[in-house]
Amino acid sequence: AGGLETAADVLVLDLEDGLPSGRKAEGRDRARRAAAHAPVWLRISAAGTLDGEDDLALGRELDDRLAGVVLAMCAGPADVAHVAASLPDGVPIVAMVESAAALLAAPAIAAHPATRRLAFGTGDFRRDTGMSADRLALSWPRAQLVVASAAAGIAGPIDGPCGPVDHARDAALHAVAMGFTGTLALQDAAVPGAHAGFTPAPDEVERARALLSASPDGPVDGSYAPTLARARALVERAEALAAL
């Protein structure tokens, strides 16, 4: 069999929650086989745990066949530092914020030089805090991740799973409105809906391009700069999604 196929922008092989504890070694073997066909992203167990150390050992073994890691249950910047020191230089690390303590540490996690993005682990976060899945309840933690990412100068965070297939587009639209730049999907069938939610409408793109075309190339009034920045970001997002 060849490599794994998906409509998603990035396929992440889940070594943390993808298999029960007694079958973790089986999951690593599958990842090893997949990496023979193309570099892979791995979701690894929490730093400092036995499973986490075994996952890092696999990452070192894969070397340049490791495209990046999603660090589950990241507790703080020390976890990012440990993972970065345990893997080949420059491997992208997406740190998952999945607890109340991790949310409070999000600015420091985002500011670590090895952190590429933050991701919101909504299920475990809700379990830790007792919050419901209601969007209003989760709006504050989502905003904290967006602000932490912006302050650290990294791309906006990745939202938690976009839910059932028929909810994926609406969940993605909400993520965009909150300032997220991606979402997780547990089903390949949910990916088209998520893509649709993140893809700007044609009339939005047309207005943004017209605004940029009509704007001067030199310095602009400070009050106008945010409008241009939003237009530029929208066009860039549309072009990136069109290229997928």
Q: What is the predicted function of each stretch?
A:
Residues 1-244:
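Expand to "…catalyze enediolate/carbanion chemistry for C-C bond making/breaking, isomerization
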